[in-house]
């Protein structure tokens, strides 16, 4: 297990993208993100793997995730990974969406990308509330029943 960390690409991708921001700043070009995970030694799954293949074979981002170049363009890979833009943009959903626009298209278009933009914005907006459960929400009302 030490030699092969397993197939946890959703975590590895987040950490790779954060590392790129740390090294190159918030205006890092899309190629720096694409090349970072394409050349990384960890295993990938579905749309991430297809994007890696495309990048390593000359199809640059963002076309690496386009449906014409990837049968996984609508997969949920970016949706799963999109927590990091929201966590890096607390209370700033537009900033999270800008990150998603740049990075999400490396591996996804269509539903996979839209889901990622939504998730990133939700994570970002979570920082604007001091209530984890709305008082009038169904779960809270159900939980309070005797």
What is each of the regions a protein language model found here?
Residues 1-146:
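Structured, active/binding-site neighborhoods that engage oxygen-rich ligands
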